[in-house]
From Swiss-Prot:
A molecular function GO annotation: tRNA (guanine(46)-N7)-methyltransferase activity
Catalytic activity reported: guanosine(46) in tRNA + S-adenosyl-L-methionine = N(7)-methylguanosine(46) in tRNA + S-adenosyl-L-homocysteine
Family in the record: Belongs to the class I-like SAM-binding methyltransferase superfamily. TrmB family.
NCBIfam families in the cross-refs: tRNA (guanosine(46)-N7)-methyltransferase TrmB
Positions with a binding annotation for substrate: K117, D149
GO cellular component: tRNA methyltransferase complex
Entry protein name: tRNA (guanine-N(7)-)-methyltransferase
Regions that span the bilayer: none
Length: 209
């Protein structure tokens, strides 16, 4: 079951910047993968174990999940994962996070809240201004991964990304990344539930041009 949290709430206007990368990661020079809407963080933790040659930051709007996720990585001594609480757009718009934005090599938006009602579409995480912010920061050949079980949301996200004219859709056969780092093959809790329920999953990859 999806837990709705209004990302436009004034509670998310004031945010704590993410600490400098050299305070968060053992090796801050590694490429950075950002997971927007990371939920409990299990997806990123699994991904980080498959490839320790990347750093990972998860952003989640439900504070309790972030607190629990950071407790997990502290207890298990992960050296390349960090979780941050808040509205992703506000966090990445914060000038104190510029070094983080400049380090982004790939981003995943997996099973974001669909906000079905049209009047609530403005609450969806992928918005034109957010894609514009990311495109201005992401280097050429940086990647965006999306997955959802809602076809209308998939079409909306794809259109928003492609209309920026900064990204093009990448065919899976053209996806060339070390197999140990492959966000497509690592499943989130939501994805496991969807597959178990035999629902369809819509997914795609976009490359910065």
């Amino acid at each position: 079951m999806r837990q709705h949290v209004n990302p436009l709430s004034k509670n998310f206007f004031e945010i704590d910047p993410i600490p400098p990368l050299n305070e968060v990661f053992e090796n801050p020079q590694l490429p950075l993968h950002l997971d927007i809407g990371c939920a409990s963080g299990d997806f990123l933790m699994e991904l980080s174990l498959k490839n320790k040659n990347w750093n990972y930051i998860g952003i989640e709007i439900r504070e309790k999940l972030v607190l629990n996720a950071n407790l997990k990585i502290k207890n298990r001594e992960y050296k390349n994962v960090y979780f941050s609480f808040g509205n992703a757009i506000n966090i990445l718009n914060n000038t104190n996070n510029k070094t983080l934005i400049d380090a982004i090599t790939s981003i995943s938006f997996y099973f974001p809240d669909p906000w079905f009602k049209k009047k609530h579409h403005k609450r969806r995480v992928i918005q034109p201004e957010f894609i514009n912010l990311l495109s201005n920061a992401m280097r050429t050949r940086s990647l965006i991964f999306i997955k959802t079980d809602v076809q209308e949301l998939f079409e909306y996200m794809e259109l928003t990304i492609l209309e920026s004219l900064k990204f093009k859709k990448l065919a899976y056969e053209d996806f060339r990344v070390n197999e140990s780092f492959n966000p497509i093959k690592t499943q989130t809790k939501r994805e496991k539930y969807v597959l178990l329920s035999q629902f369809e999953i819509y997914e795609s990859i976009y490359i910065r041009i």
